[in-house]
């Protein structure tokens, strides 16, 4: 039908999607006449057809028609024509760009239903636990009506609950939960401890936020590393003694620092160190750099917050949300903790890691939806092989986007913002104010409080109330201050969100959905009718006032984020207005290298509080955003380039783990390991020498550290024409015979299952321990690889080459350690019945080794 939809031009693709929606419309009458039982039974019919060889593309019109009718019967919502188009775009593995308020969540129901019929599981990825739970409950009602099972992954869930959720036909959850579960599954010691069951099809909500904005930060599971806690406080003290532009320089645009000779001299003097850059002091250089970075580049209530428990929590720069469980790596988080004077938690070592790019590449088919994807279309195509299709709105957009108002200073800008908000609030027009940091949202909140303007604040410190705050943001007179785009996923409806207001009213009457579910459900319909009538009246008043007014207090470094803020106004054809207030002192302008800020300000001979209208300013803003967007893109592209190395290595290791957990007979693999390890020993003792010069006694001594050697070296190998190949085969055969004898004894004594379990446990333990050590080494390689550029080398090429060499070395170490551990373990198990001469050297204790 549309198997090659990605290759079509977008205009033609939209026509094709519209034709599919027309086909779905034509089937509406037929499904409307079905009883509830007949409608839900269509799922079993579709499953039988798939089992008989039908492909899902062929079932799309019928499947969508059934899901659409079910949504109407269960939710009272019938997907519009454009929502059906969006659903079809998702089914074919595209990003559906649908404007805010166009009903992306409902559009997702149809492709999720169709793909769940295949029985391999559908993952629907959201940006937070609240949305995952909400959508699993609301949209899940449609799927359950049609006979499908629905699960949700929430952060506090235990493994058994997660396993059950993944076993469902459709599973909702956040990108972090899906990604970290994948990593934990590949650290599991038993097959039954895993929770996921594969990666067939995923739909990513707010796909730009997840696959673009968060893609610079890899997901990492860490464990304790060597303790260097005392140094963090010491270097926080030293950083406080240092002066910017004297002891170090700061590049705010690139977010880097460089310590000067004066800075190094100060540190050496304070620590009593002769040369800070001697190899023995290398860790101290890292502490110094992190302390200065923490001081100059990471600011409280902007990049992070400190909660009431004294924890330093990272704030997502794009959404304003706290990144729960995330910590800066390589000692930076500890440096910030030391700067803030809170408890410094031990530095962690990477145990498992994956980038978001590489995690989502695991899926056989991937799709996404958002209101802002067009500007990143090339990145989606190049990295994720996803096309972007812009779905036309259901109703024309009538929102007015006003030109920016620019001031010379931040103080003048905020004065103007407050006056604008006060005036609109007095008129009753709802206002949504967007800020770029927690610090600025709280500053503005204080200014509004001084002017007695009632308002709500939505930032990283108040996310528990996120949905409720956003739901009431469109009410008459409402003023909402939001950090970046916290609250995405919940529509701001003029007059208020009826369902949220209904729930609020019921709770105020003492009715609760979990504590008194029967009374709550019984009262829901009547109260909702009351609330809906009130909301319609209020919505008409708000429309007359001009709709929702969105006010941005600063241009974001990405135009896409600005557009997301604008998109909160004017949903579904509603009127609305947006405007940005900007100052020449804003962070974006300071980070831009396109113009001289001081020179520009001196040229503008205007009063501080008078807005500026100059093309050079507008051009500077556009250039600054383009510059930062390009820098961020380069950073994400760099993550992909560097990540390819670990991704290939991770796949090899995880596939090997899976074979071990699935109980594959490792006899053949172990014999190969013996051959490889013994060959390495033989080559080391014979390479580059004549046969007469071979030191076979040294070879035997070396082999004796690996296994109980029976083989006796020939004192005159050259006399009988011994070749390296023959020698290698003799020793390999000796080692294999030694292991076979032990295995036979254990199997006779304890059974085949015990021996298989012993082999599996040893190989798994050796693989995991060497992989963890390898990740630790790769972290250090990545941290220092940039220095290769000073010698004219390409850091990426060097990282690939060094990373490959280190991985080969790791695999060799896994083999050697596995063989040594197998002989040690079997010797210990058989110790009571074996003569001492047959035991491996250094293994006298006959205890179970694991």
Curated annotation (Swiss-Prot):
Gene3D superfamilies: Helical scaffold and wing domains of SecA, P-loop containing nucleotide triphosphate hydrolases, SecA, preprotein cross-linking domain. One of its GO terms (molecular function) is protein-exporting ATPase activity. It is found in: Cell membrane; Cytoplasm. Its EC number is 7.4.2.8. Its main location: membrane. The keyword Endoplasmic reticulum does not apply. GO terms for cellular component: cell envelope Sec protein transport complex; cytosol; plasma membrane. Pfam families: P-loop_SecA, SecA_DEAD, SecA_PP_bind, SecA_SW. SUPFAM superfamilies: Helical scaffold and wing domains of SecA, P-loop containing nucleoside triphosphate hydrolases, Pre-protein crosslinking domain of SecA. It catalyses: ATP + H2O + cellular proteinSide 1 = ADP + phosphate + cellular proteinSide 2. GO terms for biological process: intracellular protein transmembrane transport; protein import; protein targeting; protein transport by the Sec complex. It is a peripheral membrane protein. HAMAP family: SecA (MF_01382). PANTHER family: CHLOROPLAST PROTEIN-TRANSPORTING ATPASE, SECA INNER MEMBRANE COMPONENT OF SEC PROTEIN SECRETION SYSTEM. Part of the Sec protein translocase complex. Interacts with the SecYEG preprotein conducting channel. Has a central role in coupling the hydrolysis of ATP to the transfer of proteins into and across the cell membrane, serving as an ATP-driven molecular motor driving the stepwise translocation of polypeptide chains across the membrane. Belongs to the SecA family. This is Protein translocase subunit SecA 2. It comes from Mycolicibacterium vanbaalenii (strain DSM 7251 / JCM 13017 / BCRC 16820 / KCTC 9966 / NRRL B-24157 / PYR-1). The lineage of its organism: Bacteria, Bacillati, Actinomycetota, Actinomycetes, Mycobacteriales. The gene is secA2.
């Amino acid at each position: 039908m549309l198997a090659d939809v990605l290759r079509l031009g977008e205009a033609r693709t939209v026509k094709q999607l519209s034709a599919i929606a027309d086909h779905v419309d034509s089937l509406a009458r037929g499904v409307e006449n079905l009883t509830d039982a007949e409608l839900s039974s269509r799922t079993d019919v579709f499953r039988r057809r798939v089992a008989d060889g039908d492909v899902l593309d062929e079932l799309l019109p019928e499947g969508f028609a059934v899901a659409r009718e079910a949504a109407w019967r269960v939710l009272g919502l019938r997907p519009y024509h454009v929502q059906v188009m969006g659903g079809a775009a998702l089914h074919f593995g595209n990003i559906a760009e649908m404007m805010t308020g166009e009903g992306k969540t409902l559009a997702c129901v149809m492709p999720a239903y169709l793909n769940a019929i295949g029985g391999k599981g559908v993952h629907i990825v959201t940006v937070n636990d609240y949305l995952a739970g909400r959508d699993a409950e609301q949209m899940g009602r449609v799927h359950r009506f049609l006979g499908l099972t629905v699960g949700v992954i929430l952060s506090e869930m235990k493994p058994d609950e997660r396993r059950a959720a993944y076993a469902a036909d459709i599973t909702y959850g956040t990108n972090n939960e899906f990604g970290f579960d994948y990593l934990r599954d590949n650290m599991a010691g038993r097959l039954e401890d895993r929770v996921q069951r594969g990666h067939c099809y995923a739909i990513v909500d707010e796909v730009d936020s997840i696959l673009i904005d968060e893609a610079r930060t890899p997901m990492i599971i860490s464990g304790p590393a060597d303790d260097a806690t005392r140094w963090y406080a010491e270097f926080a003290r030293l950083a406080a003694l240092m002066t910017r532009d004297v002891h170090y320089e700061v590049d705010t645009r690139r977010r880097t620092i460089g310590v000067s000779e004066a800075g190094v001299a100060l540190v050496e003097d304070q620590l009593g160190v002769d040369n800070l850059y001697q190899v023995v002091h290398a860790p101290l250089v890292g502490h110094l750099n992190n302390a200065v970075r923490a001081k100059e580049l990471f600011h409280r209530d902007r990049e992070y917050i400190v909660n009431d428990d004294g924890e330093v929590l990272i704030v997502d720069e794009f959404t304003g949300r706290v990144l729960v469980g995330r910590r800066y790596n390589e000692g930076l988080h500890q440096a910030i903790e030391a700067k803030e004077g809170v408890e410094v938690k031990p530095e962690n070592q990477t145990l498992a890691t994956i980038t978001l790019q590489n995690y989502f590449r695991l899926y056989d088919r991937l799709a996404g939806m958002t209101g802002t994807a067009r500007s990143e279309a090339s990145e989606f195509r190049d990295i994720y092989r996803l096309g972007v299709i812009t779905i036309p709105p259901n109703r024309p957009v009538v929102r007015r986007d006003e030109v920016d108002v620019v001031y010379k200073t931040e103080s003048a800008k905020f004065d103007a913002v407050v006056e604008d908000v006060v005036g609109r609030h007095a008129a009753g027009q709802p206002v949504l104010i967007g800020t770029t940091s927690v610090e600025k949202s709280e500053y503005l909140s204080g200014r509004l409080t001084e002017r007695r303007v009632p308002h709500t604040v939505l930032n990283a410190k108040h996310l528990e109330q996120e949905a409720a705050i956003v739901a009431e943001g469109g009410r008459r007179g409402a003023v909402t201050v939001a950090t970046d785009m916290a609250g995405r996923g919940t529509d701001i409806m003029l007059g208020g969100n009826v369902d949220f207001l209904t729930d609020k009213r019921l709770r105020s009457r003492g009715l609760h959905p979990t504590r008194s579910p029967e009374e709550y459900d019984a009262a829901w319909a009547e109260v909702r009718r009351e609330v809906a009538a009130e909301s319609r009246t209020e919505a008409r008043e708000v429309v007359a006032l001009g709709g929702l007014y969105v006010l941005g207090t600063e241009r974001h470094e990405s135009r896409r984020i600005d557009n997301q803020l604008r998109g909160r106004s004017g949903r579904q054809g509603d009127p609305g207005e947006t405007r940005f207030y900007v100052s020449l002192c804003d962070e974006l302008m300071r980070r831009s290298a396109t113009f001289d800020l001081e020179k520009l300000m001196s040229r503008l001979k205007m009063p501080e509080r008078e807005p500026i209208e100059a093309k050079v300013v507008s051009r500077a803003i556009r250039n600054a955003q383009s510059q930062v967007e390009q820098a961020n893109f380069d950073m994400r592209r760099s993550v992909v380039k560097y990540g390819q190395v670990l991704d290939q290595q991770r796949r090899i290791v995880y596939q090997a783990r899976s074979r071990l957990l699935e109980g594959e007979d490792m006899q053949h693999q172990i014999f190969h390991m013996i051959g490889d390890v013994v060959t390495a020993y033989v080559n080391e003792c014979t390479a580059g020498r004549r046969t007469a010069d071979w030191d076979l006694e040294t070879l035997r001594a070396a082999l004796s550290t690996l296994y109980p050697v029976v083989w006796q070296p020939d004192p005159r190998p050259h006399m009988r024409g011994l070749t390296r190949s023959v020698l290698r085969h003799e020793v390999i055969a000796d080692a294999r015979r030694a292991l076979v004898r032990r295995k036979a004894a254990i199997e006779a004594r304890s059974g085949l299952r015990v021996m298989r379990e012993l082999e599996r446990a040893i190989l798994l333990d050796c693989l995991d321990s060497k992989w963890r050590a390898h990740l630790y080494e790769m972290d250090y390689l990545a941290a220092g690889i940039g220095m290769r550029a000073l010698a004219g080398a390409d850091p990426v090429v060097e990282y690939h080459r060094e990373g490959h060499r280190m991985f080969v070395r790791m695999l060799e170490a896994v083999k050697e350690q596995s063989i040594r551990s197998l002989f040690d373990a079997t010797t210990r198990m058989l110790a009571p019945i074996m003569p001492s001469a047959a035991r491996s050297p250094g293994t006298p204790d006959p205890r179970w080794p694991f």
